[in-house]
Amino acid sequence: MSKIIGIDLGTTNSCVAVMEGGQAKVIENAEGARTTPSVVAFTENGDRLIGQPARRQGVTNPDFTFYAIKRLIGRTFDDPTAQKDKAMSPFSIVKAPNGDAWVKGRDKDYSPQEISAFILTKMKETAEAYLGSKVTQAVITVPAYFNDAQRQATKDAGRIAGLEVLRIINEPTAAALAYGLDKGGNKTIAVYDLGGGTFDVSLLEIGDGVFEVLSTNGDTFLGGEDFDLRVVDFLASEFKKEQGIDLKGDKLALQRLKEEAEKAKKELSSATQYEVNLPFITADATGPKHLNIKLTRAKFESLVEDLVKRTIDPCQKALKDAGKTPAQIDEVVLVGGMTRMPAVQEAVKKFFNREPHKGVNPDEVVAIGAAIQGGVLQGDVKDVVLLDVTPLSLGIETLGGIFTRLIERNTTIPTKKSQVFSTAEDNQPAVTIKVAQGEREMASDNKQLGQFNLEGIAPAPRGLPQIEVTFDIDANGIVSVSAKDKATGKEQQITIQADGGLSEADIKNMMADAESNASTDKARRELVEAKNHAEALIHQTEKQLIEHGAKVTDAIKGDIEKAIADLKEAAAGDNAADIAAKHQALMNAAMKLGEAIYAAQGADAGEGEDAPQSGNDDVVDADFEEVDERK
């Protein structure tokens, strides 16, 4: 049975872990790192890069290097947050045919689900390389405050990557699992999760293997990216004052500023000052310009003070919803890279009136929790019960555009709730059920999840028909809704899909495209390997001909030289099968040279039977060890 892996699909970095020997283990990627940058790039020559290689070339390829894509997943193009992202991204965010926010690639437009799928594929391959077996199932984490559309989009990304997503789990809940699995006694904990693009806070009661989420709150557009942008704005502003040049119109300069802003932010967690030094940042008629600005920790903290304060309001709401006071919280667990910032730690300490717990790795704890949940689903982890909640209220639009809640926020999931409604007009033959999610009083102010029609209602005065609407939320927090006419028994049911979102056909096309790309990538790698093997064999054989060519007839020598020329010609092309065939032909021809060398050595030694054991034999073996590369 294949292992169920746990993946933290982060805004800035992603991480994969698996249960092994009763412990969750974070798996290192091919570059030897325990986290992988959530960056995807398309190069000019058609290569697709993922992770650190993509990040490294971002400065020279800003138009087609995609980062922080998680902030767009499940969002429409017209969403204010997507528009905000569009204004500050060096790559192009475009409107898809379904109204969603997509990104413009070199050859086509990509959905955030596809870009996320490339990152998930990298995580999947990382796990497969470590485990030595195929991986098909995963638990993937999302911010607790993700709505239904964002959760569904994340699940779709998993499918495109070839993964069956067994469970979508909230990031703070996953962190609590990792923190509390081996803790004894009953505790009420707060998980403060400030990551690269999102902020969540969850309150949980843990004890005896039961993890019960009491409340959750957050902001899906607040994270490290916003802190970076404040530094970028500051640096660009200072440079404009000094040089009169606006760097924000220069994509290359903007990308360099962003990279340096991120470095400054990290350094200022331990240092009190950071020197931003970017030579040749731009040029004008007078020549090249250099940027050199000193940024102190105090200045950085003043730039982001309001962002840190924005995390406190959700903390207050989460406490209120759970009916708790800060004094009733036994432990505050910090999650996410931004919690390394001293000002963030101080704000948490001040609000909860206690030192936050720093005993978990904020970059890895979420993936570890996801792996533990995978272990629970696989049966490897016993006696653990996880009771999560829905982060936002769910309901429908009723007469006058009012939002009528059926399921209140922070309701334990999975859950099911029904309520009876009626018609607004006499002899109304159908009703449209408009489903929304949020906390505003008017339906139009909340997130519209979708709509469907219940038709064939028997003619009757308004208010008489009884339409039973049922909401069902599964353990992933994904919603399905049904409406039933109690008089006729007619029923209509849908799993909510946002007005945008990917259709089943879209997902299948993207899955096929991903598989096709995987085949193309494999073929490209095989071609490169074939060329490398060919060059090695050509070099070795030419060397042997120079040293031992006199030991064979001119005919044999001519055959070998022709085989070398044929392989050189094949290696200059792009046909891996042709290269392999010519490679084999040269090996066959070169064997005659090898036989002649052995025969000559035997004659020199005067001991025919012992000649193969001569000291020089090692050299000959090494020269023709290329035989193994046919395997």
UniProtKB/Swiss-Prot annotation:
Signal peptide range: none
* The keyword Chaperone belongs to this UniProt entry's keyword annotation: yes
Induction pattern: By stress conditions e.g. heat shock.
Bridged cysteine pairs (disulfide): none
Q: Which residues carry this modification: Phosphothreonine?
A: T198
Cite the SUPFAM superfamilies for this sequence. Actin-like ATPase domain, Heat shock protein 70kD (HSP70), C-terminal subdomain, Heat shock protein 70kD (HSP70), peptide-binding domain
Q: Which Pfam families match?
A: HSP70
Top-level taxon of origin: Bacteria
Specify where the region named Disordered lies, as residue ranges. 603-631
Keyword list, A-Z: ATP-binding, Chaperone, Nucleotide-binding, Phosphoprotein, Stress response
List the biased-composition ranges (Acidic residues): 618-631
Instruction: List GO molecular-function terms, semicolon-separated.
Output: ATP binding; ATP-dependent protein folding chaperone; unfolded protein binding
Establish whether keyword ATP-binding is in the entry.
yes
The protein's matches in PROSITE patterns, at most eight in alphabetical order, are given as: HSP70_1 (PS00297), HSP70_2 (PS00329), HSP70_3 (PS01036)
The record's annotation in InterPro entries points to: ATPase_NBD, Chaperone_DnaK, Heat_shock_70_CS, HSP70_C_sf, HSP70_peptide-bd_sf, Hsp_70_fam
Q: What does this protein do?
A: Acts as a chaperone.
Say which family it is in: Belongs to the heat shock protein 70 family.
Name of the protein: Chaperone protein DnaK
**Organism, per UniProt?**
Hyphomonas neptunium (strain ATCC 15444)
> Which classification does the entry list for the species?
Bacteria, Pseudomonadati, Pseudomonadota, Alphaproteobacteria, Hyphomonadales
Recorded name of the encoding gene: dnaK
